[in-house]
Curated annotation (Swiss-Prot):
The active site is at C245 (nucleophile). It catalyses: cytidine(1407) in 16S rRNA + S-adenosyl-L-methionine = 5-methylcytidine(1407) in 16S rRNA + S-adenosyl-L-homocysteine + H(+). This is Ribosomal RNA small subunit methyltransferase F. GO terms for cellular component: cytoplasm. PANTHER family: 28S RRNA (CYTOSINE(4447)-C(5))-METHYLTRANSFERASE-RELATED, NOP2 YEAST -RELATED NOL1/NOP2/FMU SUN DOMAIN-CONTAINING. Specifically methylates the cytosine at position 1407 (m5C1407) of 16S rRNA. Keywords: Cytoplasm, Methyltransferase, RNA-binding, rRNA processing, S-adenosyl-L-methionine, Transferase.
């Protein structure tokens, strides 16, 4: 597949100068010319690994565990009839197609830690690591998912929506703003930094077309600014994971050492040599993971885990925020929403959430977001659960996909034919059934959306960004 991969001589000379002595250039080049193995991560917000393995076996998928992620697997599957992304399991949010190496930074962030209340993902799109973090948080606390490129926020939101994430707040800023705007607000920060992408050759034969050593030096300056900002945003005793999909020490070890030189004893490097079996094979003397592609048959990657041992003085910023357009619901109003939701769909509001109102829209925010409200501008927070109208509430899609358990009384089960129609955005007519009002829609054990009975027809409530129109399961 990638035998014709472009690898500049200058790049090979550079890699040879930084490659550990026990590795060789011939195996590096050979691995760069091999296509990546396809990998997926089970989304435990929707299904347990055990139940997913049963499904995979039924479908004839062969899975091999990814050693650094309990929910990750390399997959061999027949995609001749429908690609993995168009299977019902994928569209239902049961799994995420994610490169195995990219599962490592969230695993490192949560190593030995279970109870983060506020987490920042500084460069979040398209959402593989964000949704992995949300699953590790079990949808509790608040997860701020930031993406600098406005064009990528839409796909980030679509993936968060598909995977049933309800504790996220999305923002669209340069990651360098967080240290000044939200100093010492987060228990954990993931900085998967923009980089020269030297480790991505195996999935992009032209990844090195524009590579120069000067571009490495230039982007390292940006990375140093980003890691300082991320460190400022971290609470004392909080954990920062810095990662890249590149190999140059200028963008990796040197960026981490810059942080240590800047903040001294407040910075502690924590070793990742026990993160998984054979992690020692890529562990540096500082305890970082510097992964060349031939070692684990993966992308090239770098991961560092850093603890903040003491408070540091944040940069001063002048904030100019407009009026916050939401109003927190009164206890009485929140209780009314909860009662109506329980009556209509047999769904309970989680105890760690708050109802907020914007005009006629009803939103559910993570309770842990409240300290940041008024301090920062988010592009989207929590989930929209309803629109108010004369007769009460019109419930929204994410109520079904993020709050329903699948054991509710008000459910319609679809056949495979009707499920295909549903994912194509069409209304369905379940055989021999009729009803009234809103109804949870289920296929093969998974809640896939919210519909409304109109006689014997269920009106489709699938958001446009989740509709697929061809080549389905």
């Amino acid at each position: 597949m990638h035998a014709n991969v472009y690898i500049p001589e200058e790049f090979l000379t550079h890699i040879e100068s930084i490659m550990p002595s026990h590795l060789d250039m011939a195996s590096f080049v050979a691995s760069c010319q091999k296509p990546l193995r396809k990998s997926i991560r089970v989304n435990t917000l929707k299904i347990s690994v055990e139940d997913f393995l049963v499904r995979a076996k039924e479908k004839g998928w062969e899975l091999e565990p990814v050693p650094w992620c309990e929910t990750g697997f390399w997959i061999t599957a027949d995609e001749s009839e429908a690609p993995l992304g168009n299977t019902a399991e994928h569209m239902s949010g049961l799994f995420y197609i994610q490169e195995a190496s990219s599962m490592m930074p969230p695993s490192a962030l949560f190593q030995g830690e279970a109870d983060y209340q506020a987490v920042l993902d500084t460069a979040a799109a398209p959402g593989s690591k964000t949704t992995q973090i949300a699953a590790l948080m079990n949808n509790r606390g608040v997860l701020v998912a930031n993406e600098y490129a406005a064009s990528r926020v839409k796909v980030l939101h679509a993936n968060i929506e598909r995977c049933g994430v309800r504790n996220a707040a999305l923002s669209n800023f340069d990651g360098r703003v967080f240290g000044g705007w939200l100093p010492e607000q987060f228990d954990a920060v993931l900085l998967d930094a923009p980089c020269s992408g030297e480790g991505t050759i195996r999935k992009d034969a032209d990844a090195m077309k524009n590579w120069t050593y000067q571009s490495v030096v230039d982007i390292a300056d940006t990375q140093k600014d980003l890691i300082e900002s991320a460190f400022h945003a971290l609470k004392p005793n909080g954990v920062l994971v810095y990662s890249t999909c590149t190999l140059s020490t200028e963008e990796n070890q040197q960026v981490c050492h810059h942080l240590k030189e800047t903040f001294g004893d407040a910075v502690e490097f924590e070793s990742l040599e026990s993160l998984f079996d054979n992690a020692k094979a890529t562990t540096t003397e500082e305890g970082f993971l510097h992964i060349f592609p031939q070692v684990y048959d993966s992308e090239g990657f770098f991961v560092a885990r850093i603890r903040k041992l003491a408070s540091v003085t944040p940069p001063e910023v002048k904030k100019r925020l407009g009026k916050f357009p939401f109003e927190k619901a009164s206890k009485k109003a929140q209780q009314e929403v909860a009662e109506q939701l329980l009556g209509a769909l047999d769904i309970e509001l989680p105890s760690d959430t708050q109802v907020w109102i914007r005009d006629k829209d009803v939103w559910l925010f993570p309770e842990a977001l409240e300290p940041m409200i008024g301090e920062f501008r988010f592009s989207r927070m929590g989930i929209k659960i309803a629109e108010t109208h004369k007769k009460g509430y019109r419930w929204q899609h994410q109520v079904a996909t993020t709050l329903a358990t699948g054991n509710e009384a008000n459910i319609v089960d679809l056949s495979i034919e009707d499920a295909r129609e549903w994912f194509m955005g069409r209304d369905v007519r379940p055989e021999g059934l009729s009803g009234e009002g809103e109804v949870l829609v289920k296929y093969n054990g998974a809640i896939i959306g919210l519909g409304k009975w109109v006689g014997n027809r269920v009106k489709n409530g699938l958001p446009r960004e989740l509709v697929r129109d061809k080549n389905l399961f």
